[in-house]
């Protein structure tokens, strides 16, 4: 009798590593792992994740590149709306999860999977984003969530993997790191309380730049179009290059405290150098190019758009209506912004209108 197929949304982190081993060893499924890359991983990292999947027992692994789609359908509008949840968080993981879920469920349908699985816990928002998207787009495919259903701790998962012969840097696995084009979130024991901060070592990007630097960002109709005079047709490449330029200053680090979709408080650390610089520069440019009423209504609509995106409502038709408004608002948002980079901070210096 053929084994049941399950497609697992796989990042290579602790929770999904546990899920591969558990679903194959304990449940007897053929596990097909898939990573939906939103631009946070380079080719070397993707290769390492693939090797990890096979080492854990996956029968097949797929890398789904959705970076350009993610930019065109989400990041662009988050910039247009200057979206920072609670004035702090650039909705890094929140926004990419929906597109990852769409890619994963489409892959599951493509290979004829019986089930789809993810490694989300029962405490956060990702479980809702995955479940809701899966249920809307493929209600006939069952959903398996081992980490949530068994209320597992990270310590338990580490011990389980050790007992089953899987070796890794388990010290590093003590932190849940979600890396994407629009920022990286970091969760660990410190984020479970309100009076602790993440250690420097928990951040993937370390502060190595000590000399201040002045850079310029160019925008055309609201979109990032140039860095230091270099023009970019590929907006994803512009974001990646700006991240490489600014991340060594440890810019864009913060702790976000917010209300989860399920109604409890959540706390997470993040680093997002490029997103924070782009949003700040874009907003400064808009002050010169939009009327006060355009700015006012865009602030209201942008807040709603960010809230809906955060709460797994991307597929709600009103989101397309809001995007049409945001597109219209950017017709005159063209110019250059000068920024000074310093360790742990930045200063907006000047905005030049083209």
Name each region found by the language model.
Residues 2-353:
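Nucleotide-activated chemistry modules centered on ATP-dependent adenylation/adenylyltransferase
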């Amino acid at each position: 009798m053929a084994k049941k197929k399950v497609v697992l949304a796989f990042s290579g982190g602790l929770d999904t590593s546990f899920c591969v081993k558990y679903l194959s060893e304990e449940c007897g499924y053929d596990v097909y792992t898939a990573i939906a890359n939103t631009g946070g991983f380079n080719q070397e990292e993707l290769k390492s994740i693939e090797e990890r999947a096979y080492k854990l027992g996956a029968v097949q692994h797929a890398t789904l590149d959705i970076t350009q789609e993610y930019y065109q359908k989400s990041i662009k509008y988050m910039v247009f709306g200057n979206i920072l949840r609670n004035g702090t968080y650039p909705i890094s993981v929140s926004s990419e999860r929906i597109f990852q879920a769409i890619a994963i469920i489409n892959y599951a349908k493509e290979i004829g999977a019986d089930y789809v699985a993810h490694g989300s816990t029962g405490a956060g928002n990702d479980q809702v984003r995955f479940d809701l998207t899966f249920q809307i787009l493929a209600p006939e495919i069952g959903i398996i969530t081992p980490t949530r259903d068994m209320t597992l701790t990270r310590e338990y998962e580490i011990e389980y993997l050790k007992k089953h012969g899987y070796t890794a840097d388990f010290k590093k696995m003590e932190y849940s790191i979600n890396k994407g084009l629009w920022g990286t979130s970091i969760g660990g024991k410190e984020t479970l309380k309100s009076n602790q901060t993440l250690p420097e070592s928990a951040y993937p990007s370390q502060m190595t730049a000590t000399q201040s630097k002045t850079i310029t960002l160019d925008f055309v109709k609201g979109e990032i179009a140039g860095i230091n005079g270099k023009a970019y047709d590929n907006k994803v490449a512009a974001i990646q290059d700006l991240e490489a330029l600014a991340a060594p200053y440890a810019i864009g680090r913060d702790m976000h405290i917010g209300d989860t979709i399920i109604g409890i408080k959540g706390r997470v650390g993040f680093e997002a150098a490029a997103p924070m610089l782009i949003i700040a520069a874009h907003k400064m440019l808009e002050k010169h190019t939009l009327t006060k009423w355009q700015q006012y209504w865009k602030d209201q609509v942008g807040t709603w758009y960010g809230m809906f995106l955060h709460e797994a409502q991307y597929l709600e038709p009103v989101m397309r209506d809001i995007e049409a408004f945001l597109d219209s608002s950017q017709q005159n948002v063209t110019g250059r912004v000068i920024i000074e980079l310093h360790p742990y901070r930045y200063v907006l210096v000047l905005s030049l209108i083209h």
